[in-house]
Swiss-Prot record:
Bias (Low complexity) ranges: 150-170
Entry-linked PANTHER family: LARGE RIBOSOMAL SUBUNIT PROTEIN BL17M, RIBOSOMAL PROTEIN L17
Stretches for region Disordered: 137-183
GO MF assignments: structural constituent of ribosome
GO cellular component: cytosolic large ribosomal subunit
Keywords: Ribonucleoprotein, Ribosomal protein
Family: Belongs to the bacterial ribosomal protein bL17 family.
Highest taxon of source: Bacteria
BP terms from Gene Ontology: translation
Disulfide bonds: none
Taxonomic lineage: Bacteria, Bacillati, Actinomycetota, Actinomycetes, Bifidobacteriales
The protein, known as: Large ribosomal subunit protein bL17
Length: 183
């Protein structure tokens, strides 16, 4: 567990605070998200992230270290099998704290702490895609210029063929007209 902050504790004694954080961590892993006060959520986050890191290791020693905090074996099993697999690609930042409206009874600042289950957006892949898009944009004008040149060349080749075909069609007509005049 991280070094406690100086000043008043969340509960009346250090033992009570440890038990309260362990119970909140158990509830977080069972339900995926819990609603609590903001100071409790901020104190729970480092503990929960450390337990998830142990679960990702997956060895016996890590399981025993988690069992020191979370006494419920079924929750430990869920943590090591399901949650650790979900967080396999993530290198930290397993939890998210979202502030919500103050609590109705005493106006205490409330928050929701939840496990982050969205897949990790790979930055390297995004950078490679952006680089490929830039290269494609640079090559696109060159390809378009080549395509227009090729189209113009095809039109130039087709135009003389059409002109010669038209000239040949006119030539017999002219010869026929000359022959009629001669007769």
């Amino acid at each position: 567990m991280p070094t406690p902050k100086k000043g008043p504790r969340l509960a009346s004694s250090p033992a009570h605070e440890r038990l309260m954080l362990a119970n909140m961590a158990t509830s977080l892993f069972q339900n995926g998200r819990i609603t609590t006060t903001l100071p409790k959520a901020k104190r729970l986050r480092p503990l929960a992230e450390r337990l998830i890191t142990f679960a990702k290791r997956g060895d016996l020693h890590s399981r025993r270290r988690v069992m020191r905090v979370i006494r419920n074996k079924s929750v430990v099993h869920i943590l090591f099998t399901q949650i650790a697999e979900q967080m396999e690609q993530r290198e930290g930042g397993y939890t998210r704290i979202v502030k919500i409206a103050p609590r109705v009874g005493d106006a205490a600042p409330a928050a929701v702490i939840e496990l982050v289950t969205e897949p990790v957006a790979k930055k390297a892949v995004v950078k490679e895609a952006e680089a490929a898009a830039k290269v494609a944009e640079e090559e696109a004008p060159a390809v378009e210029a080549e395509a227009t040149e090729a189209a113009e060349a095809v039109e130039a080749v087709e135009a003389p063929v059409e002109e010669t075909a038209a000239a040949e069609a006119e030539a017999p007509a002219e010869e026929a007209a000359d022959a009629e005049k001669a007769e």
